UniProtKB/Swiss-Prot annotation:
Family: Belongs to the aspartate/ornithine carbamoyltransferase superfamily. ATCase family.
Gene: pyrB
InterPro entries assigned: Asp/Orn_carbamoyltranf_P-bd, Asp/Orn_carbamoylTrfase, Asp/Orn_carbamoylTrfase_sf, Asp_carbamoyltransf, Asp_carbamoyltransf_Asp/Orn-bd
Protein name listed in UniProt: Aspartate carbamoyltransferase catalytic subunit
PROSITE patterns per UniProt: CARBAMOYLTRANSFERASE
Assembly notes: Heterododecamer (2C3:3R2) of six catalytic PyrB chains organized as two trimers (C3), and six regulatory PyrI chains organized as three dimers (R2).
Chain ranges passing through the membrane: none
Catalyzed reaction equations: carbamoyl phosphate + L-aspartate = N-carbamoyl-L-aspartate + phosphate + H(+)
EC number assigned by the record: 2.1.3.2
Upper lineage: Bacteria, Bacillati, Chloroflexota, Dehalococcoidia, Dehalococcoidales
């Protein structure tokens, strides 16, 4: 069972437990052990306590510089990382891609060289090409935190999803967690499959055939607890957690869907469908939500929704990642 610290008294315990952290970068969750995932959860619990204090700031990363490098638009993720860095007293360098040398054709590696020359100790990056953060990690000295690369991965989102579930459930072991939406093109889904599996959850992926991942079958060797489903009623039945995923409009243009309304008719999580889940089931979504398409408006704002809590917890989880990767010994 994962213990999430909820009081300041746990800080000393945390400092003695996180010394075994080995990762310089956070690129995805495939190379994280169960123990390392637990370590992130424990650290995030302490960070969440810090954020509840009158002064929401500690000097753990004072003197460090964290750069944000986003090649794709982002509001909540970029703001969350920036607030996390500032809450640890780090200096933040925001690079505006549209107004930088990148818009003139500067390469990723040249941009990273520039950021390192400016003193960046860590770089949070989002890139449209899968694998770009790995290229960065192999070619610069700064810590790289992947804030989303192509269809590949979004590890901090998966970690905050796990953390949010653990704020309500004592363990993920044996929980039925259903993900509904564009699984095939969702970096959030891909990282969650790794993270939730390692935490012992039973995962159901629900989507039209055209939006289910190729090469992943029910009860596969790598993910024996993953089930693929095209019937939303079967997918949601008995679920402990139901997570909607953003339907990207460009998928309709590519011919993978007959239409947005057609999708909503068969795959929208509404109150009637939600009744098939357990009575205490959590409703989640990484955002932004297309209301009345992926989730009905009443479900988004209903009592079982923890979507706003996910946003809040995201800051604590990203603080934890900064803290752990920095090697800091103080909070």
């Amino acid at each position: 069972m994962t213990h999430i610290p909820k009081t300041p008294a746990d800080t000393e315990t945390l400092l003695s437990e996180v010394q075994g952290w080995k990762h310089r970068h956070v690129l995805d969750l495939d190379n994280f052990s169960r123990e390392e995932l637990d370590m992130v959860m424990q650290t995030a619990g302490v960070m969440l306590d810090i954020l509840s204090r009158p002064v929401k700031k500690v000097p753990a990363l004072k003197g460090k510089t964290i750069a944000t490098l986003f090649y794709e638009p982002s509001t909540r993720t970029r703001s969350s990382f920036e607030l996390a860095a500032k809450s640890l007293s780090a200096d933040v360098l925001n690079l505006n891609v549209s107004q930088s040398s990148i818009s003139k054709g500067e390469s990723l590696l040249d941009t990273l060289d520039t950021l390192e020359s400016l003193g960046a100790d860590m770089v949070v990056m989002r890139h449209p090409l899968s694998g770009a953060p790995y290229l960065a990690a192999n070619n610069c000295h700064a810590n790289i935190i992947n804030a989303g690369d192509g269809w590949h991965a979004h590890p901090s989102q998966a970690l905050l999803d796990i953390f949010t579930i653990l704020r309500h459930k004592s363990s993920l072991e044996g929980l039925k967690i259903t993900l509904i939406g564009d699984i095939k093109h969702s970096r959030v889904a891909h990282s969650n499959i790794w993270g939730l599996s390692k935490m012992g959850a039973k995962i159901t992926l629900c989507a039209p055939y055209t939006l289910l991942p190729e090469g992943l079958n029910t009860n596969s060797k790598i993910f024996p607890e993953v089930t693929l489903e095209t019937d939303i009623k079967q997918a949601v039945s008995g679920a402990d957690v139901v997570m909607g995923l953003r339907l990207q409009r460009e998928r309709q243009q590519s011919g993978l869907l007959p239409g947005i309304r057609e999708y909503a008719r068969y795959f929208q999580l509404n109150e009637e469908i939600l009744k098939l889940a357990k009575s205490n089931a959590l409703v989640m979504h990484p955002g932004p939500v297309n209301e009345d398409i992926e989730l009905s408006q009443s479900v988004v704002h209903g009592e079982q929704s923890v979507i706003k809590e996910q946003v809040k917890n995201g800051v604590a989880v990203r603080m934890a990642l900064f803290y752990l990767c920095s090697g800091s010994k103080e909070i």
